[in-house]
UniProtKB/Swiss-Prot annotation:
SUPFAM superfamilies: DNA-binding domain. InterPro entries: AP2/ERF_dom, AP2/ERF_dom_sf, DNA-bd_dom_sf, DRE1A-I. Transmembrane segments: none annotated. Transcriptional activator that binds specifically to the DNA sequence 5'-[AG]CCGAC-3'. Binding to the C-repeat/DRE element mediates high salinity- and dehydration-inducible transcription. The keyword Transcription regulation applies. GO terms for molecular function: DNA binding; DNA-binding transcription factor activity. It comes from the Eukaryota. Residues 20-44, 143-184 are annotated as: Disordered. The keyword Transcription regulation applies. This is Dehydration-responsive element-binding protein 1J.
Length: 242
């Protein structure tokens, strides 16, 4: 009887000890981590939203160009790394012109005549890809060189136009305007006097007039008939000068 009672006590104590150990372990481990959602892991998009074959590389903000080789599934041609997305897009156009010619899909329509790149042989394999890469890089470098030369020429012409000497046109002050307006009536009066006296100076005109008054009158005509009234004057001559 006593033995059975002791065994029951031992069993109860062991059960309590095991329950306490399980609670302590659950508290130490904490709540279970949430399950990771199934599906493809998201990654940061580096491709350019507009240009073909262009994507961003690293945190430096540079752009790389990589094109797919036509007729070769899974093969890609690394063209190079560039400072701007536009340069990488031009490199893509140069590489595609070398690989596909006039049927190439271009980022810029004017690349067909602005980029001078030779067409690769039709049966070119992987051995020709380095030549295509070199030709594309040289075409882009030449295009950038032409652009910088044109920009320098435009800036030089603008500086020359800004440093040109000013025109030597006379500058009139308000005093000059008043003087010209004041001299206008005097000139008009002088012209009026000239027209009045037949283009002769005023002093010469009056001098000739005084000289004319000093001239002796002409002698009376001898054959002229006398002046008669209605009753007749009997042919008597009348002196005109007293």
């Amino acid at each position: 009887m006593d033995v059975a009672r002791d065994m029951e006590k031992n069993t109860t104590a062991m059960g309590q000890l095991m329950s306490s150990s399980a609670t302590t372990a659950a508290t130490a481990t904490g709540p279970a981590s949430p399950k990771r959602p199934a599906g493809r892991t998201k990654f940061q998009e580096t491709r350019h939203p507009v240009f073909r074959g262009v994507r961003r590389r690293g945190r430096a903000g540079r752009w790389v160009c990589e094109v797919r080789v036509p007729g070769s599934r899974g093969d890609r041609l690394w063209v190079g790394t560039f400072d701007t997305a536009e340069e990488a897009a031009r490199a893509h156009d140069a590489a595609m012109l070398a690989l596909c010619g006039a049927s190439a899909s271009l980022n810029f329509a004017d690349s067909a005549w602005l980029l001078h790149v030779p067409r690769a042989p039709v049966a070119s394999g992987h051995d020709q890809l380095p030549d295509v890469q070199r030709a594309a890089s040289e075409a882009v470098a030449e295009f950038q060189r032409r652009g910088s030369t044109a920009a320098t020429a435009t800036a030089t012409s603008g500086d020359a136009a800004s440093t040109a000497p000013p025109s030597s046109s006379p500058v009139l002050s308000p005093n000059d305007d008043n003087a010209s307006s004041a001299s206008t009536p005097a000139v008009a009066a002088a012209l009026d006097h000239g027209d009045m006296f037949g283009g002769m100076r005023t002093d010469l005109y009056f001098a000739s007039l005084a000289q004319g008054l000093l001239i002796e009158p002409p002698p009376p005509p001898t054959t002229a008939e006398g002046f008669c009234d209605d009753e007749g004057c009997g042919g008597a001559e009348m002196e005109l000068w007293s």
